[in-house]
Amino acid sequence: MFRKTSLAAFAGAMLAASLSPASAQFDLKFALDWKFEGPSAPYFVALDKGYYKAEGLNVTIDTGPGSVAGIARVAAGTYPIGFFDINSLVRFRDQNTDKDVKAVMMVYDKPPFAIVSLAKSKINAPKDLEGKVLGAPPPDGAFAQWKAFVKENKIDDSKVKIEAVGFPVREPMLADGKVDAITGFSFSSYFNLLTKGIKEDEIKVMLMADHGLVLYGNAIMVNPDFAKKNPKIVAGFVRATIKGIIDTYKDPEAAIKSVMKRNETADEKIELARLKMSLRDNFITPWVKANGVGGIDDKRMQQAIEQIAVTYEFKNAKPKPADIFTPQYLPPAAERKL
């Protein structure tokens, strides 16, 4: 009798131990920069495959207001973790010295900031924008880099008419010829134009990173108070997200299914192509292939800060890479390799 009871107790204890992550789930709100589209697949893959759950996390993923505006939500603690533009974080930190928000994981090693136009506008080089009308949403992450892009390419911006447009009408205005070009994320504007009936060979995408910008793109950033109180939660979220990115890279066709479950009105063919473009151009660069997912090159980050300083007047001392990005929550490099 004693043996049976002991065995039963032992089995129960082992079962409890094996279920402990699931039974102590921490509710965590995570804000994307934008809609549930192809490039958001890694987070939903991590959710569907139980990677977050294995870290003891019950993650809720919400859409966001753009890659710039959401930073304030993380700073305020509305969302403890978010996915936003690291260059805008540099400026935000300078303007809000009491908000020690830091990036903890780089996602877009090469930013998707782009100038998108139609072939008929004959915008083949940056200076071709002179004399044109550029449609730009004020909260757009790409437009946030406009001044640096102008400086690097010696554009006379007095000859470029900037027209403030909303995100919903940005691509329609370009398609209708109401503006000559727009700022946007490459994989967003390109495929949005395809859905408007514009042919592939009529769409011109000019990546700012191919024209002088050394900037990074969107990163995972964390509220400082939350990170201080919950370092294991942050590390677990980062670890699970990296697994989601690696799985998405290995099998984008399977990964896109996780997006479609949350956005049934989307066109799966378009979203898969959007995902593949972002993986090729933004997520998985030669540097990431060599060094793994999630980290940064401090020298490049310092160059990016210097580039921001060309067109942005810092109120305080220019930050160092360590002021903006911390690798302390990243898993070992071996776990981040593709």
Q: Which ranges hold each PLM region?
A:
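Short, glycine-/small- and polar/acidic-enriched structural segments
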Residues: 26-176, 180-187, 206-208, 213-214
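Conserved C-terminal helix/tail region of periplasmic/extracytoplasmic solute-binding proteins
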Residues: 301-338
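Short, surface-exposed acidic
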Residues: 157-161, 200-204, 265-277, 314-323
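Secondary-structure end/capping motifs
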Residues: 228-313
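Bacterial N-terminal signal peptides
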Residues: 8-18
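Periplasmic-binding protein-like
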Residues: 107-117, 200-226, 238, 277-283, ...
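Bacterial N-terminal signal peptides that target proteins for export
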Residues: 1-9
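Sec/Tat signal peptide C-region and signal peptidase I cleavage site
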Residues: 19-24
